[in-house]
């Protein structure tokens, strides 16, 4: 199996912290060959690999089978899976599609491993003849220096939840999903990815917003009376919106999300990381969809 930053032959697009961990877990069992596409961290990863310090798996040095700086370097490779783990920012969408188009073949499966509701939809539109999977990550991780990945906590039993989004053949998509998640116990196949995406959306809207607004990690937010009040208000509003849109979100989801963070080590959310580093925020992915749904209602 070959993966563009995944396992079989897999290609992973833009090696973020999430993408680096996903690539590592997909390759480590030895059943796949992984190519990673790196940008600013290319020299470090090409020379020394990824240096990972994780609360789940300990410390490791992970060297992908191949490290590329430009997708044109691997455009003649037949990839079984292509994984996009880039930030879900609208300014990069067109570039992402145009790059991935160079390595997608009729049998290639595309996995969108990004934040937001249905971020994979642009792939289903661009590649209607291919199987498209949607993935959700429940890890707190960051790239603290080029190629150096720190994973501090997780709020779910599995790191990655993956489900089917679209495919010309349901049977084929189911087989490709099973094949992918079989590579590592960190991956879990889920039946209804939409519900899981909405639960992650509640989590992101609540804690990314609160931590960025208060410039504090999750524990400091939850230890504050005003912080816990804000968190619960955001979570309940997002939960109620999901129900109004017909999402079968389980009862107790809001309490469960808050309890998960109360029992986890402090989390510096991705939005807070980006804010402190002066990087663009994933506002469209995390908050823009809610505005759209509110207009619909």
Curated annotation (Swiss-Prot):
InterPro entries named among the record's database cross-references: 6-PGluconate_DH-like_C_sf, 6PGD_dom2, KPA_reductase, KPR-Related, KPR_N
EC code(s) of this entry: 1.-.-.-
Binding site residues for substrate: 115, 204, 208, 270
One GO molecular-function entry: oxidoreductase activity
Keywords per UniProt: NADP, Oxidoreductase, Virulence
Pfam family, one: ApbA
Record-annotated membrane-spanning stretches: none
Coiled-coil portions: none
Pathway stated in the Swiss-Prot or TrEMBL entry: Mycotoxin biosynthesis
Active site: 200 (proton donor)
GO cellular component, as recorded: cytoplasm
Binding residues for NADP(+): 14-19, 115, 282
Family: Belongs to the ketopantoate reductase family.
General remark: Gene clusters encoding host-selective toxins (HSTs) are localized on conditionally dispensable chromosomes (CDCs), also called supernumerary chromosomes, where they are present in multiple copies. The CDCs are not essential for saprophytic growth but controls host-selective pathogenicity.
Annotated function: Oxidoreductase; part of the gene clusters that mediate the biosynthesis of the host-selective toxins (HSTs) AF-toxins responsible for Alternaria black spot of strawberry disease by the strawberry pathotype. AF-toxin I and III are valine derivatives of 2,3-dyhydroxy-isovaleric acid and 2-hydroxy-isovaleric acid respectively, while AF II is an isoleucine derivative of 2-hydroxy-valeric acid. These derivatives are bound to a 9,10-epoxy-8-hydroxy-9-methyl-decatrienoic acid (EDA) moiety.
Name of the protein in its database record: Oxidoreductase AFT12-1
Taxonomic lineage from the root: Eukaryota, Fungi, Dikarya, Ascomycota, Pezizomycotina
